[in-house]
């Protein structure tokens, strides 16, 4: 079985959801602390929100099957920090929860050989497929658009104070896409009052946005980090916390964002 699913669309847009996977291989699961098996740091139910939009708009969609505890697809292959000097965060092969508690049982952490093997088995196939799909879209349409979707708990006191804005749009401070795309999406977010929002705030875009956002080559990428309160009941067990009523308010705005990207012309 493939470590990811790619559905090819008919428009120049690819939606990537790199942190929705939940599978953990049995041989790895037995080395993790019991708490890890609940996959609390997953971007829960995000595929349920985005897949209907991708189908409706004819966009391509790529999603992993495996948990970010196996490999973090939004980190560089050499595991260099995305925000040098910043505290917190997790690496290519995480060994700690967001809360900085250990993921692994004592003495069971992966060594360099295992990290390299996971990179080869999980990270590389996903990125080869992602890059290949962007190349296909560019060849077919003259340009390619990448929307990297994420979600996060609204409050993570060990990483930041208070509550995050509901919608956090990142364009690597404008480097990952044409200025007009940032302007169009920023204006759309600023023009609504249902969700708090910020552009290039705490979340400016991870490896995927920064690496594949190459405006000079006709390849434009943005990241949306959405608080889970937008579509989930955060007081519940996350595996069953999807809220149809909340999601019904968030989905139309995300659809408008995707349409704004598609309406842009180089």
Per-range role (PLM):
Residues 1-146, 151-266:
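N-terminal catalytic or cofactor-binding beta/alpha core of small enzyme domains
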């Amino acid at each position: 079985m493939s470590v990811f699913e790619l559905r090819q669309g008919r428009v120049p847009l690819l939606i990537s959801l790199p942190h929705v996977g939940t599978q953990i291989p049995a041989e790895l699961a037995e080395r993790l602390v019991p708490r890890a098996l609940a996959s609390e740091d997953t971007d829960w139910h995000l595929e349920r929100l985005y897949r209907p939009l991708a189908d409706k708009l004819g966009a391509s969609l790529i999603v992993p099957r495996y948990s970010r505890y196996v490999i973090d697809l939004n980190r560089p292959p050499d595991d260099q920090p995305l925000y040098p000097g910043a505290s917190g965060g997790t690496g290519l092969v995480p060994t700690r929860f967001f809360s900085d508690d250990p993921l692994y049982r004592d003495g069971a952490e992966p060594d360099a050989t295992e990290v390299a093997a996971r990179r080869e088995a999980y990270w590389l196939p996903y990125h080869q497929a992602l890059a290949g799909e962007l190349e296909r879209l560019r060849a077919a349409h003259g340009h390619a658009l990448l929307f990297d979707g994420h979600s996060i708990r609204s409050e993570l006191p060990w990483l930041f104070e208070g509550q995050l804005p509901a919608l956090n749009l990142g364009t690597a401070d404008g480097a990952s896409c044409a200025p007009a795309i940032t302007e169009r999406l920023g204006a759309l977010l600023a023009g609504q009052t249902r969700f708090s929002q910020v552009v290039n705030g705490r979340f400016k875009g991870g490896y995927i946005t920064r690496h594949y956002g190459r405006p000079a080559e006709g390849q434009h990428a943005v990241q949306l980090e959405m608080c889970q309160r937008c579509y989930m009941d955060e007081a519940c067990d996350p595996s069953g916390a999807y809220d149809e009523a909340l999601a019904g308010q968030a989905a139309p705005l995300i659809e408008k964002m995707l349409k704004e990207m598609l309406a842009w012309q180089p």
